[in-house]
Amino acid sequence: MVRAFKIKVPASSANIGPGYDVLGVGLSLFLELDVTIDSSQAQETNDDPNNCKLSYTKESEGYSTVPLRSDANLITRTALYVLRCNNIRNFPSGTKVHVSNPIPLGRGLGSSGAAVVAGVILGNEVAQLGFSKQRMLDYCLMIERHPDNITAAMMGGFCGSFLRDLTPQEVERREIPLAEVLPEPSGGEDTGLVPPLPPTDIGRHVKYQWNPAIKCIAIIPQFELSTADSRGVLPKAYPTQDLVFNLQRLAVLTTALTMDPPNADLIYPAMQDRVHQPYRKTLIPGLTEILSCVTPSTYPGLLGICLSGAGPTILALATENFEEISQEIINRFAKNGIKCSWKLLEPAYDGASVEQQ
């Protein structure tokens, strides 16, 4: 019997305002996997060591450089981890995965998180494991241990999340693949052993309301910035007053984004940050000027502005004048010789999905 299904996983923006490693929002830009399993086509997947033929649309981000071996690609490495945790060595015979990825790589829009979520769902579906989203989240968080992007991509909407501490024994297994956000070897080694199942409830989250009038403008510079490099510039310790600054604004922002009408006088200052953005200005030319000079008083409709994830993408929340706001930020990047594109997005309220075909 031939099986076919489509997996869709949204991009995400994390570190919203003061919510470093806490707040994330799923965005209406989707990684898509078209999957078929047909044992009569097994000869077409024999070149792959794990029975999976992987391909990408030519329009996909990273089309010319993304690895196509199932044990090297992050999506399929993740799926193999799920399978092997459940004592299944390989993909079913004749598995084909065709990927369409419009999410820019290394720009702070959750491309790695989307790949991990897609991979966990792929493993769950091909083996018909029947996991809930909450259980799949545990698998995701073993691989990418930053719950803000992962939770927003899996669950959708505007989320706050935290990750409980894991023991060294729980995270040191070589079979666990590691996403690109961590400055470590890629993991996912095939030791021939059955990896232990992930602990349950590794991450906890809540979904906040979001005023639907608020749109997300992503201004995307044409250069990549790895999360590992971006984390490398952060200090090991912070002044107490900087942590209090963020905590105060975090408490206000999660409610301010639900209010109707949106209040720029409340949201704009509540989206300020002292934990990561000041330290990343050396990696993103023009960042300080952009965050301080593009304001609601100069651009009506603008509510707030921040780095998206680790950057370099800028996330601006607004209710109108989207093109004018985008062009101003693009022009400021251009002063530093950096070209940009921009996208107008909305929250992806439902998160990741599977459609049987």
Curated annotation (Swiss-Prot):
NCBIfam families listed in its UniProt record: thrB (TIGR00191)
One of the record's GO molecular function terms: homoserine kinase activity
Loss of function: phenotype: Threonine auxotrophy. Leads to accumulation of toxic levels of homoserine. Sensitive to thermal stress, cold stress, high pH, sodium chloride, lithium chloride, UV, caffeine, 5-fluorocytosine, and compounds that increase flux through the threonine biosynthetic pathway (including tacrolimus, amitrole and sulfometuron methyl). Decreases survival time in an in vivo model of infection. Double knockout with FPR1 is lethal.
Enzyme Commission identifier(s): 2.7.1.39
Lineage of origin: Eukaryota, Fungi, Dikarya, Ascomycota, Saccharomycotina
Top EC class for this record: transferase
One Pfam family matching this protein: GHMP_kinases_C
Database matches in Gene3D superfamilies: 3.30.230.10, GHMP kinase, C-terminal domain
Domain of life according to the entry: Eukaryota
GO annotation (BP), single: homoserine metabolic process
Catalytic reaction annotation: L-homoserine + ATP = O-phospho-L-homoserine + ADP + H(+)
Keyword line: Amino-acid biosynthesis, ATP-binding, Isopeptide bond, Kinase, Nucleotide-binding, Threonine biosynthesis, Transferase, Ubl conjugation
Function: Commits homoserine to the threonine biosynthesis pathway by catalyzing its O-phosphorylation.
Pathway info: Amino-acid biosynthesis; L-threonine biosynthesis; L-threonine from L-aspartate: step 4/5
Protein family per UniProt: Belongs to the GHMP kinase family. Homoserine kinase subfamily.
Glycyl lysine isopeptide (Lys-Gly) (interchain with G-Cter in ubiquitin) cross-link, renumbered residues: K133
Quaternary organization: Homodimer.
Miscellaneous comment text of the record: Present with 92600 molecules/cell in log phase SD medium.
Protein name: Homoserine kinase
Organism: Saccharomyces cerevisiae (strain ATCC 204508 / S288c)
